[in-house]
């Protein structure tokens, strides 16, 4: 039954969304197995979960799984362009599920949606748990509480005009407005949140930064660093969705072209592999000597951006850092060069500086594709204004690989909820899931691919010092 408090684009899209969910179920064997094992037990009964994660069909199936396990949900997307409106419509019809997401939100609307997903009552009551992607929901709670303390002690309100970009100004404006309405909302909310589980590399960096400064207000489980997330979603997911996004956006031939991949972490590895497989000449930029030598050993040229910027046909950032492709680089690119980002946030490329630069002409070609005429007359193609091109220009990672990631999210939520009173997890620390669960997630997906495990005999188990049922590797093993 549709929750009238939801805010979505078009409820009439729900039947199509439900059909897509039904089709994708067969491609998400892990989530379906979790449902079979846990649905009758309702282990999440009573849990209020806020989600801030791309509102796709795969996410809809994650939400439905959490709901079937007993949870109540309030959900928003973590990117203004990544929502599939038919997915939002379909999942909003589930009992005890509210959705605040639509494709093409403004930044002001985006943060409104995040606040709505976090707010469970008229007096500002919050969730028990958070499913996060990029840590935006958790960040809002932390910064809100921080500014409330400043207001309580010194009567200083956040000044939106001090924001370094439009998004930060919207963010500060929301917190200012919130404090004037309820000066203890985020502080009170943070005290009741049991914990959060974080999906991405970028979000983990954000959480670690808060933790390092002794500012973590509730437990965090780092889902990204589970092997069955990091090595599958980040590598194989990007290997599938990057070329999908590039081809849908441009229809340009990739074979024979020069593709520059900025960053050779797990995401970069998947991107470079995909481009190589399509016949591109791949160049990699890196700061880490370990990642750089890995790229060279795979046959890629490792260069600086300055060396290749005037020659590249496609540029893709995937570093999790800021200001990777600067304005000075953009202005030097050749005619019809394509620029996009597959890292979580939009500040890897200085798009705002480009769009406001004197002499620039911007022409929208189609949704999330802009052609920018540079002062020298060259035209470059900018994808998704520097946001996630695989989700903005296509539909993101395939369902099968997301089944791995979302199994880890479900297990993280179960761990937090079931151990809320045991003391297993400290409130101001971050954790990763135990290896037993990592192996369990992998095991769930073997049957779908007709793979059969070899079983160790007793002598082999004794020699290795492991159980027949695992875990089979030490915590230090890097796969």
UniProtKB/Swiss-Prot annotation:
EC numbers for this chain: 3.13.2.1
Pathway assigned to this chain's UniProt record: Amino-acid biosynthesis; L-homocysteine biosynthesis; L-homocysteine from S-adenosyl-L-homocysteine: step 1/1
Name of the protein in its database record: Adenosylhomocysteinase
Cofactor: NAD(+)
Cofactor binding mode and count: Binds 1 NAD(+) per subunit.
Keywords: Hydrolase, NAD, One-carbon metabolism
Gene Ontology MF: a single term: adenosylhomocysteinase activity
Assembly mode: Homotetramer.
GO cellular component term, pick one: cytosol
Species of provenance: Plasmodium chabaudi chabaudi
Keyword presence, NAD: yes
HAMAP family, sorted: AdoHcyase (MF_00563)
InterPro entries for this protein: Adenosylhomocyst_ase-like_sf (IPR042172), Adenosylhomocysteinase-like (IPR000043), Ado_hCys_hydrolase_NAD-bd (IPR015878), NAD(P)-bd_dom_sf (IPR036291), S-Ado-L-homoCys_hydrolase_CS (IPR020082)
Family: Belongs to the adenosylhomocysteinase family.
Residues given in the record as NAD(+) binding sites: 200-202, 234, 263-268, 286, 321, 342-344, 390
Keyword Protein transport: no
Catalytic activity as recorded in UniProt: S-adenosyl-L-homocysteine + H2O = L-homocysteine + adenosine
